[in-house]
A protein has these predicted regions:
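Positively charged n-region of N-terminal signal peptides that target proteins for export
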Residues: 1-4
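Surface-exposed, glycine- and small/polar-enriched segments that build interaction surfaces at terminal
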Residues: 20-205
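Hydrophobic h-region of N-terminal signal peptides that target proteins for export
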Residues: 10-18
Length: 205
């Protein structure tokens, strides 16, 4: 019974993903974007408005409406430009972006990772990890880490910022709207607390 239920759920989930547009198990992109949201100069299969469910290689920069699987890039993955929902691993020397990462997104880049809306997973880079508007559940590690809404997990960097925090922030400057967890840093801010700033170690519950 459990096996039958699992199969039914898997089929329904796959049908939901594939119903959002055409898809391919393999994708490839050649070229760079001239400007954000401008696909001139990019030769890509499948097209940006379609999806890849499996493996995509970008010999420059790539973007798809949905990208589920492994996405290595020679330059960057820019799925947010196609409002793409990403599930899986993005790896690029420059940057990775995604429209959403609710399926579970893992971003590893040299400089910058961004999810425009809510996400689960981890972001690892040198300079800035950002979840712009929604929640983030997972790990962020870079010089700067930012979550626009609720955060559950761990942020490690010089500057960490989020909405309601459940978890841990480790850095020089930590900033949260509310705290149910731990902040370790030179300055720790909780804007909805009577004592907004507290040094070194701060515990909230």
């Amino acid at each position: 019974m459990k096996k039958v239920t699992f199969v039914i759920v898997s089929v329904l989930a796959s049908a939901t993903l594939f119903a959002e547009g055409r898809f391919s198990p393999i994708g490839m992109s050649i070229g760079l974007y001239l400007t954000p949201n401008n696909y001139e100069g990019v030769a890509q299969f499948p097209l940006c408005e379609d999806g890849v469910y499996g493996f995509r290689l970008a010999l420059g920069c790539a973007a798809n409406r949905n990208m589920v699987g492994l996405a290595p890039a020679v330059y960057a993955n820019d799925d947010a430009a196609a409002r793409g929902n990403v599930g899986g691993l993005q790896v690029a020397p420059a940057f990775n972006t995604a429209g959403k990462g609710e399926l579970g997104v893992w971003q590893v880049s040299g400089f910058y990772n961004k999810v425009a809306d809510s996400a689960n997973g981890f972001q690892v880079c040198a300079f800035l990890n950002e979840v712009d508007q929604g929640y983030f559940y997972g790990l962020q590690t870079a010089l700067g880490n930012k979550v626009g809404a609720d955060f559950c997990g761990m942020q490690i960097g010089l500057y960490n910022a989020c909405g309601a925090e459940t978890g841990m922030q480790i850095g020089l400057w930590n900033d949260a709207k509310s705290l149910c967890g731990i902040q370790i840093g030179l300055l720790n801010f909780v804007t909805e607390s009577p004592m907004i700033c507290f040094p070194v170690l701060r515990i909230g519950w």
